[in-house]
Amino acid sequence: MKNQSVDAVDHLDRAVLAIGTDYADGQLLSWHHHRRAQLLYGVTGVMQVSAGAGAWVVPSGQAVWIPAGMAHQVRMLGVSTRSLYIEPASAPRPAAQCEVLAVSALLRELLLQAVEMPPEYDEQGRDGALVTLLLHEVARAPSLPLHIPLPRDDAALLALCERFLAAPRIDARPQAWARSLHVSERTLQRRFRQAIGLSFAQWRQRACLAQALAALAQGVPVTTVALDLGYDSPGAFSTMVRRVLGRPPSALAARQPVAGHNAPACL
């Protein structure tokens, strides 16, 4: 199925529904939720996902797992997707929060094949076997560190985090944050760990990586992205991206715009 709202087929007696969708660049899917769990795979572009526990950035070629019933919104930056909508009883991942997943070559091909299946596919035939293998591959997909958690119970720290996300820089120093909160640097680091589960440096890097992926998807040159984020050199920036994602920034740069039309507002 392609460019079809899941609401139109959600009633079908199938454990997994696969839908391919092309989105206009910059299209925002405002807050919504699905009865089924969702695996949202980006063939092209970058997806920016927001949910209760923070934000996730999903580079091209990777996917985000969204548990059943979780309210979320997604901004699409040059994105064509392949989604699986999975009955909660068949969900292959136990996560209670969103996760960005690394998509193997096998999982990618299975996703591309799945959207070619008819909605009421033969569960006892080839399509049923494909779905079974899909669920196994989703279950074993490794999680990537592309979640930007936000504090829930520390309003002052949350305000600083949100301000930083508007203009992240890798050269931001914890001493300045500590002064803003009128605490010692040691206390700041402890509050970060308690409220977010990451060190200041780890969270800062994730925020910068999220900004970088969005900028690269919009065609900003690698050198400009690196310098805007405060890296000493494009090489230092490229090293960080390779270490986290296993790919150079050039592999994440904007591709040809996706042909198509505006997709349904909630998918």
Label the model's feature ranges.
Residues 69-98:
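Ligand-binding loop in jelly-roll beta-barrel domains
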Residues 1-46, 265-266:
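Generic protein-terminus/edge-of-domain signal
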